[in-house]
Amino acid sequence: MTSRKKIPLNRRSFMARSACSAMGLTGIVSTLAHMKLMQGALANTSSSLNDYRALVVLFLFGAKDANNFLMPGLLNPSRANYDTHRGVLALPTGGTNPTHPIVASNLATQPSAPAGAEYFELHPSLPDVKSLFDSGDLSIAANVGTLVVPTKASTYDSVALPPQLFSHSDQQNQWQSSLPDKPFQSGWCGRIADILHPQNTDSAISMSVSLSGINAIQAGLTQVSPQYSVTNAGAVTLGGYGNKYSSALTDSQDKHSYKSNSSGRRLKAFQDIMDYTHDHLFEEGYNNVVRQARENEGYVGAALEEADSWLHPTAQDSRGRPWPFMTATFLYQHGIDPSGLNNSNISALGALPDLARQLLKIAQLIAGRRCLENKRQLFFCSYGGHDTHQDQGGYSGNGVYVPGDLDANMGVLNDALKAFNDCMHALETFENGQNDAFSYDDFILASHSDFNRTLTPNGNLAGPSGSDHAWGTHVFTMGGNVRGSNVYGYYPDLDPAGVWTTPGSSRGRWIPTCSVEQFTAPLAKWLDVGDSELATIFPNLDRFSSPFGSTYNPSGYDSMLANPNMDFLEGI
């Protein structure tokens, strides 16, 4: 081992050397993709980003039943097919479990839209999502899915289709890569990080932060901004040194403030080892990972402490101490009175669902963003359990609603989105007048899911019945630059044996009218990915009609494929 010395290396040199090293480690196809990304990144090194923007991707694993997430309203031309074919899973607009009506403003003013096309209903467990939609904070994109090329029922048997079309694992990877016709190498967020990383000057941690472990969507090709995992409790710490290193350090934010006890001496010895270089490449590689983890831990810890210094004006714990604003907001939204809890005990948050804890941590990291020093941040979170082949929930023959898994899942989603959105609005108000103040326009949350589920149920009993694997699904976006109160794309006619569904099936598997890249490319552009780099991040995008327009033409499948109607973001 030798003493560590810094070797002067600017970004351009580092990236060039990284590209050269890749030539000996990957195949020619991977290397060409790598080089394209490096070329795009090098082209951006002369510019920098002056504002802050955070993209949050929420993946609903298991394939949520989008047919009961967004339903046609009573006046919608698709309603008759919904009532006829949804069977025991159908959710009437009245009854003991009423749905929530919404009106798509863009379709209400669209002359070419069929009469009543603007009327929809949201699942009964989504009252706050209805409010988000009505207020303009949230929009929905209909019938999005993985596509190799534009596809319709008449070409289904003659064009290339996404491999393993109805397989969970394959479709999850294809949504995250946006390259369904290629073996997985990287995710679309990872490729964005490859391109934008050079403009994130002086960043403290990676652009790519995951609250749901290592994932596919943030996997890059160049590894200049590898994904960094944070738990619901914060950064992963070294074990054996107490909470926030209280047994070894006098100041948790100063990694050299060692105590004179055995824990302090042990941590100092460990730190000294990390300050050496190692001749063995594996040893040095491991050492670098541990060292970077310790540094990231400090930055994340500082960001979370910064966020928690913002106190709620009324919420106090069982000892009369004020709660951090964001934590109290999430607790209140989930019906938990924080006054009976001890806010120094992290287990108090155990009553929150996992999705809520993930979004709470993301909200805190956004509030503490100055400690992370990234102008662009990519967050990933997830919520599983949506594979409702049974026990989905529906009405029995005597008109009594039998609650199921979809009800519980939508309730968790509703509360988490509402609490997160409330925190983003409140953060804008709290920081008003500060330097680099946060704006509600500074974030977008976008959902993904494996695929939709069949319109027709797989049984005729409300309790045990569910739905099966399908294709085109409905996703949503939330944030200040989202053109809210609108439904984009094209909503299916819900005829399970018609032109919208896959041939040979009478279950209602909608062929997507919008590809994953047509939905995600606007998100990349919002992050300031240049037009010339979009083709590098989304190589298949030019196979489809441009999503950067508001043209709407529902006169036929060809017209819909030519006019995707994905103009859901402002300022791009």
Question: Model regions: which residues?
Answer:
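Active-site lining segments that contact anionic ligands and/or coordinate catalytic metals
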Residues: 376-378, 440-442, 448, 470-473
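Short, conserved, surface-exposed binding loops centered on an aromatic residue
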Residues: 370-373, 434-439, 462-468
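Metal-dependent active-site segment of extracytoplasmic phospho-/sulfohydrolases and closely related
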Residues: 421-459
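Feature for exported/extracytoplasmic and membrane-associated proteins, marking the mature portion
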Residues: 2-412, 422-432, 477-478, 486-493, ...
